[in-house]
């Protein structure tokens, strides 16, 4: 197979550009730090989840309700050969219990993994860290978000997953199932 001259030139140009990226020393002022985010909607409001703070995503599983004094607990589900507790992300963020169907589970934690149930997934985005700003969260998620990101004319609160995990641990410790 022969490659036409314009295509061969473009390939050579791309190859040279690729090689140059390894020849330039990395420094913090030359390399823009990025953050990978999942864009979701909770009760119709736009939110973002940091990919580095989650351990996986699975499609919705049958969730078996269990008696609990923890209102955010939806039940347990079988994921990756084991059982995980499934919590409503909307309820953890302070929203009233929603009747929206659960479409996906976001896995969080490593030693005691839990799943956060959500309905609307809007996509995966890589943004510059400079696009993420610290600010005062708005109701109802006050205390559960500490940052916001603006992409394509939409400002999204960035959910603080470690904070949610601590909240779950406190609630479960105070009210065992």
Residue ranges of each PLM-predicted region?
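An acidic, low-aromatic, low-complexity terminal/linker signal
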Residues: 1-177
């Amino acid at each position: 197979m022969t490659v036409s001259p314009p295509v061969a030139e473009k390939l050579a140009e791309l190859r040279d550009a690729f090689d140059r990226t390894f020849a330039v020393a990395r420094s913090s002022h030359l390399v823009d730090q990025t953050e990978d985010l999942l864009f979701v909607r909770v009760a119709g409001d736009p939110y973002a989840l940091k990919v580095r703070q989650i351990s996986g995503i699975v499609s919705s599983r049958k969730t078996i309700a269990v008696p609990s004094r923890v209102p955010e607990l939806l039940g347990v589900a079988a994921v990756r050969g084991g059982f995980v507790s499934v919590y409503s992300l909307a309820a953890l963020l302070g929203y009233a219990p929603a009747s929206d169907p659960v479409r996906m589970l976001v896995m969080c934690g490593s030693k005691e993994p839990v799943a956060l149930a959500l309905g609307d997934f809007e996509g995966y985005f890589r943004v510059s860290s400079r696009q993420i700003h610290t600010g005062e969260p708005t109701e109802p998620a006050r205390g559960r978000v500490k940052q916001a990101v603006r992409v394509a004319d939409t400002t999204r609160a960035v959910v603080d997953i470690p904070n949610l995990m601590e909240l779950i641990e406190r609630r479960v410790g105070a009210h065992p199932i």
